[in-house]
């Protein structure tokens, strides 16, 4: 083969290799789902990391929480996306994903982490408890993930996804409540991405409006992607306080999408797209807040419950003390009256009048 042809072939080979994704490719064209033969119980057969250490999501409970005063508030730079720009919304067969620009980034971590996409996890209309992370065993209605990659060390999210300290994900717990106009800027486009592979463009808006109040309060731990290949390369920030969306908005999320293509003869609804909580392997979760809030099914914190209990006990004590005081006062008064009747002087006076 002529030298020029060899050189051209070598260049072509380098170009092909450069274009290949850095993240692990499916084994033998494998696919994955949340249920069935390719469900999460089988993930580790094709994606070994899914059965390894540092897996996510986890249950956030008091036994594993430790306050860390060095956890400072994060700063969200470039989150206010211009309404004049359009951003791609995609049904990827597992969730609905919104692509984000890399100039949107987090400050406050050891490196700069630039945004790449956001997506959601949810349950189903009959069991609307589809968050991935749980708090003291309790699921929330849904969960938002905003995915960032370490742009100080790696050129893109694909390269960073299987590298140490490669990814940082912000997790927002979502509960049912009042209508949320910011989330509706995504939900209003769901009908345009109903089937797998469908895409639509969403005008830019302030992504920071998707975050909860008091973002300085959060849980922090090292974990993994919650979907295959489950790379244990994620620095998780799970915000302590949830956001609310309305029942109608949640229902739209739970019923609008399909995991299958439009022409699939056996369409499958996109529901229950959340991974079960994983073993925690004696890790610790660090908190930026000193008083741990444990959420209950009623939505009350442990502090509020204890306050109500103490108030109830105090009220009972007051009632008991007042009752004893009234009883003793009545007894003393009755004793005084008996004393007046049986005084000797009174008896003598009675006998004189007889």
Curated annotation (Swiss-Prot):
Record note on what altering residue 121 to Q does: In HYCHL; severe decrease of activity in the presence of physiological NaCl concentrations; no effect on localization to cell membrane
Keywords, sorted A to Z: Cell membrane, Disease variant, Disulfide bond, Glycoprotein, Lyase, Membrane, Metal-binding, Signal, Transmembrane, Transmembrane helix, Zinc
Source organism, top-level taxon: Eukaryota
Record's subcellular location: Membrane; Cell membrane
Regulation (activators, inhibitors): Inhibited by coumarins, saccharin, sulfonamide derivatives such as acetazolamide (AZA), benzenesulfonamide and derivatives (4-carboxyethylbenzene-sulfonamide, 4-carboxyethylbenzene-sulfonamide ethyl ester, 4-(acetyl-2-aminoethyl)benzene-sulfonamide, 4-aminoethylbenzene-sulfonamide) and Foscarnet (phosphonoformate trisodium salt).
One GO CC term on file: membrane
Extracellular side: 25-301
Cofactor: Zn(2+)
InterPro entries named among the record's database cross-references: CA_dom (IPR001148), CA_dom_sf (IPR036398), Carbonic_anhydrase_a-class (IPR023561), Carbonic_anhydrase_a-class_CS (IPR018338)
Residue ranges of coiled coil: none
Zinc in keyword set: yes
Membrane-crossing residue ranges in chain numbering: 302-322
Catalytic reaction equation(s): hydrogencarbonate + H(+) = CO2 + H2O
Topology in the lipid bilayer: Single-pass type I membrane protein
Domain Alpha-carbonic anhydrase span(s) in chain numbering: 30-289
Effect of residue 143 to K: In HYCHL; severe decrease of activity in the presence of physiological NaCl concentrations; mutant enzyme is highly inhibited by acetazolamide and shows higher sensitivity to inhibition by anions compared to wild-type; the mutation affects the chloride-mediated negative feedback regulation of the enzyme leading to excessive chloride secretion in sweat; no effect on localization to cell membrane
Sites where the protein binds substrate: 226-227
Tissue and organ expression note: Highly expressed in colon, kidney, prostate, intestine and activated lymphocytes. Expressed at much higher levels in the renal cell cancers than in surrounding normal kidney tissue. Moderately expressed in pancreas, ovary and testis. Expressed in sweat glands and bronchiolar epithelium.
Active site location: 94 (proton donor/acceptor)
Signal peptide start-end: 1-24
Amino-acid positions noted as binding Zn(2+) in the UniProt annotation, renumbered to this chain: 119, 121, 145
PROSITE patterns, sorted: ALPHA_CA_1 (PS00162), ALPHA_CA_2 (PS51144)
Keyword Signal: yes
Residues annotated as glycosylated: 28, 80, 162
Disease: Hyperchlorhidrosis, isolated: An autosomal recessive disorder characterized by excessive sweating and increased sweat chloride levels. Affected individuals suffer from episodes of hyponatremic dehydration and report increased amounts of visible salt precipitates in sweat.
Name of the molecule in the record: Carbonic anhydrase 12
Biological classification of the source: Eukaryota, Metazoa, Chordata, Craniata, Vertebrata
Gene designation: CA12
């Amino acid at each position: 083969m002529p030298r020029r042809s060899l050189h051209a072939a070598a260049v072509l080979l380098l170009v092909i290799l450069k274009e290949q994704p850095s993240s692990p490719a499916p084994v033998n064209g494998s696919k994955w789902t949340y249920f069935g033969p390719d469900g999460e119980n089988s993930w580790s057969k094709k994606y070994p990391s899914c059965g390894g250490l540092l897996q996510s999501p986890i249950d956030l409970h008091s036994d594993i929480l430790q306050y860390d005063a060095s956890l400072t508030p994060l700063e969200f730079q470039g989150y206010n996306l211009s309404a004049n720009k359009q951003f791609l919304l995609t049904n990827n067969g597992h969730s609905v994903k919104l692509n984000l620009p890399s100039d949107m980034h987090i400050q406050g971590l050891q490196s700069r982490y630039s945004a790449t996409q956001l997506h959601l996890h949810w349950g189903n209309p009959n069991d609307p408890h589809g968050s991935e992370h749980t708090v003291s065993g309790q699921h929330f209605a849904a969960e938002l993930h905003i995915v960032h990659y370490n742009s100080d060390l790696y050129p893109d999210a694909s390269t960073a996804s299987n590298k140490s300290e490669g990814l940082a994900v912000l997790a927002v717990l979502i509960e049912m409540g009042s209508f949320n106009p910011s989330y509706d800027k995504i939900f209003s486009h769901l009908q345009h991405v109903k089937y797998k592979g469908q895409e639509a463009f969403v005008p830019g808006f302030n992504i920071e409006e998707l975050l909860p109040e008091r973002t300085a309060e959060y849980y922090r731990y090292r974990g993994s992607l919650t979907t295959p290949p489950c790379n244990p390369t994620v620095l998780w920030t799970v915000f302590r306080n949830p956001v609310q969306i309305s029942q109608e908005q949640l229902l739209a999320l739970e019923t609008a999408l399909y995991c299958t293509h439009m022409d699939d003869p056996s369409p499958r609804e996109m529901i229950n797209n959340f991974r079960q909580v994983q073993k925690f392997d004696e890790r610790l979760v660090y908190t930026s807040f000193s008083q741990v809030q444990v959420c209950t099914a009623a939505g009350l914190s442990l502090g509020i419950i204890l306050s109500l209990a103490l108030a109830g006990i105090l009220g009972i004590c007051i009632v008991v003390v007042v009752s004893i005081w009234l009883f003793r006062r009545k007894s003393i008064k009755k004793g005084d009256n008996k004393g007046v009747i049986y005084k000797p002087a009174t008896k003598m006076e009675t006998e004189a009048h007889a």
